[in-house]
Regions:
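Short, mixed-charge aromatic SLiMs
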Residues: 39-48, 136-143, 295-300, 331-339, ...
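Active-site core of glycosidic bond-cleaving carbohydrate-active enzymes
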Residues: 302-332, 381, 385-388, 398, ...
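C-terminal capping/lid segments that line or modulate ligand- or cofactor-binding pockets
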Residues: 6-37, 309, 361, 417, ...
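Helix-terminus loop motifs that line ligand-binding clefts
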Residues: 280-294, 320-381, 387, 394-398, ...
Length: 641
């Protein structure tokens, strides 16, 4: 929660379909984010996640004066994580107590609800006006009003539709006021819906604003569909909508983490879980971008962040969301194969950034698009891990192995054989993106080796004989080393500052390095090399390894470095790097959660299922409880020794 603050960084509510970003001004909603709905950012430029038409805009007046940031006392906002509600309270001009909640309805992925309660502290005339705000990425907005009086409904619908500026995608937003008792809604001079109410001293009054935002990505006729969603929700009633919303969030929270003895860590972990849950949903066949549904950061594209950082905690705690994240990739296997073909390779070459069609939308000024090839291996590894958790052999045969097979073929065609018989992957951008155009990046090669080995195991389970080349390349891929045994990030690396963890990923999650002394050697070497303003997840993966090595205090030191320097007021949302200003960084949330689940609690996914490895807790933690793990929703506990 937060009192009034000059520095204000957003805290969104989301349901996996839309994200709603409330703001600090009374009744203000900054923007709506639509999951996986794209337009070009500019003529002939790459795709960018679009902001939705905002149907929740309200202009509230008390005795003819607009309720804005002035004459406000007792201002407080909080995010209720369990209920996924954004709550604001204040007193206006000593005349009106106000409380309102904003939520993205979990039971309706394209709808949101604003519930308002007021109490008159003096006799007041209240007027509330609702309209839609149309972002500048749209053309030709059209406003339509419709009256619904049937089956006990008395609704005044307000619909605003428009086309996106560059690709002519139609988006429609509809809203309607809902009251406990009959209240007359009229049309204002500027084609908005408005109602007025006289309140006596001590009188309570409440109303709700229901809105839906639909697009041609999901509906052939988004205009009528946004109307239908509001009509349906109004007929269900506010109480039932909220009951269903809370019921579905209660189900999500069955996958939970409890930390006994550290309230700060508990809040950070629950905040991270909340943001992943609110950015995705089971059955959507969609994935999570680096900033979830909180902004247009990184154009809303899907990166390795998904499979490497956000997918693992969802795989442990929510099978439905994990499956949707997998579906996102298997649905886009064909364009990945076409991309490999266009670059002269075999198999499937997944794009570094992915939008709805699964082609490469990375801006052309960035070399990551054509050269950061570890992404294909990362996706194949996640595919095998999904099978190891689910044990769904039918899925493996029909969806998983076909993807793994095509990635294996790409990796074999991408590798080059050296004169000594070893194999190299040359001219890549590393996970450490400060390193461009290098040969034999340790992480890229180790990930490729892991993906090839996993593909061979999957082939055997599917009754298919794996090509000999898969094993030959996997065995022969070079992993550079310094003379003292430290993993060398790439051939020619000589101690430069790195953007983020790279060689350190060989111990976890790749398990390419397993001896404790080798893991410790790499940790000690690379920790001081990490750019202190780099992405948040680097320190979490180092912390995880220290926890497994038995050093709980060092693990804790790095754990808090993965989120404390990145927290922003007033809610403590985290940015990508220390000093950043664009929250919420869901990739960092994924790293933080892996630190707790797989580090402090010691859970490890193997070919044969989940094992709990030895691990150490910080001294002030009493125990950690991870609930709802895997298909059987098991509970794991690690107590202080």
């Amino acid at each position: 929660s937060s009192a009034a603050s000059d520095v204000y960084k957003r805290q969104a509510v989301g349901n996996g379909g839309i994200g709603i970003l409330p703001w600090k001004e009374p009744f203000s909603i900054k923007q709506i984010v639509l999951n996986h709905v794209f337009d070009a950012g500019a003529p002939h430029e790459v795709s960018r996640l679009i902001r939705g038409i905002n149907p929740f805009s309200m202009n509230v007046k008390v005795d003819g004066q607009v309720v804005d940031g002035t004459h406000i006392s007792g201002w407080e906002q909080c995010i209720l994580l369990k209920e996924a509600l954004h709550q604001t309270r204040f007193v206006y001009a000593n005349k009106l107590e106000v409380s309102y909640n904003i939520c993205a309805l979990r039971s309706m992925p394209y709808a949101g609800l604003v519930q308002v309660k007021v109490k008159a502290l003096a006799p007041v005339d209240l007027s509330v006006e609702n309209g839609a705000e149309v972002p500048d990425e749209y053309l030709q907005p059209r406003i339509q009003r419709k009256s619904i009086q049937d089956y006990g409904l008395h609704l005044k619908l307000l619909r605003t539709s428009a086309l996106t500026r560059h690709r002519n995608l139609q988006v429609s937003a509809t809203s309607a006021f809902i009251f406990e008792n009959d209240t007359k809604v009229e049309e204002s001079d500027n084609k908005r819906n408005i109602f007025t109410k006289y309140l006596k001293t001590g009188e309570d009054f409440s109303f709700a604003l229901l809105g839906a935002v639909c697009s041609q990505r999901d509906f052939i006729d988004p205009c009528n569909e946004s109307d239908r969603e509001v009509i349906y929700g109004a007929k269900e009633g506010v109480d039932r909508l909220m009951d269903l919303h809370l019921e579905q969030w209660n189900e999500l929270w069955k996958g939970d983490i409890q930390i006994v003895g550290d309230d700060e860590a508990q809040r950070a972990v629950r905040f991270a879980l909340y943001h992943l849950y609110s950015s995705a949903r089971s059955g959507s066949r969609l994935s999570i971008p680096p900033f979830g549904l909180t902004s247009q950061g990184y154009n809303g594209h899907i990166f390795w962040d998904t499979e490497f950082w956000m997918f693992p905690p969802m795989l442990f705690l929510n099978q439905g969301i994990a499956r949707s994240m997998m579906d996102y990739r298997t649905d886009r296997l064909k364009p990945a194969c076409q991309r490999a073909f266009s670059y002269g390779y075999r198999g499937a070459m997944f794009p570094w950034e992915s939008d709805d069609v699964g082609e490469e939308p990375c801006p052309t000024f960035a070399l990551t698009g054509p050269f950061e090839h570890h992404i294909s291996a990362d996706i194949a590894i996640a595919t095998w891990n999904y099978y190891c958790m689910s044990r769904d052999i039918r899925w493996l045969r029909e969806d998983g192995f076909p993807l793994m097979e095509q990635v294996a073929e790409f990796l074999v065609s991408r590798a080059e054989q050296n004169e000594d018989g070893s194999y190299s992957i040359c001219n890549v951008v590393c996970a450490d993106e400060y390193a461009e155009g290098v040969d034999d990046n340790a992480f890229t090669n180790a990930a490729a080796r892991c993906a090839l080995q996993d593909a061979s195991k999957a082939a055997a389970l599917c009754g298919i004989k794996a090509p000999v080349s898969w094993n030959a390349v996997a065995k022969g891929l070079r992993i550079p080393k310094f003379s003292d045994g430290v993993t060398r990030e790439y051939e020619g690396y000589d101690g430069q500052i790195i953007k983020q963890a790279d060689a350190s990923l060989l111990a976890y999650p790749l398990k390419a390095i397993t001896r404790p002394e080798e893991i410790k050697r790499d940790l000690l070497y690379y920790e001081p090399k990490i750019d202190k303003s780099g992405p948040a997840m680097s320190y979490s993966v180092l912390a995880l390894q220290y926890a497994r090595l038995g050093d709980g205090e060092k693990a804790y030191e790095l754990f808090v470095r993965s989120f404390r320097p990145n927290q922003l007021p007033p809610f403590g949302v985290i940015s990508e790097g220390a000093g950043g200003t664009n929250p919420y960084f869901t990739t960092g949330a994924g790293g933080l959660l892996q630190m707790v689940i797989n580090g402090f609690c010691g859970l490890d996914l193997t070919d044969n299922g989940i094992k709990q490895l030895p691990s150490a807790l910080p001294k002030h933690w009493k125990k950690i409880i991870v609930k709802g793990v895997g298909p059987n929703r098991r509970t794991y506990v690690r107590e202080q020794q």
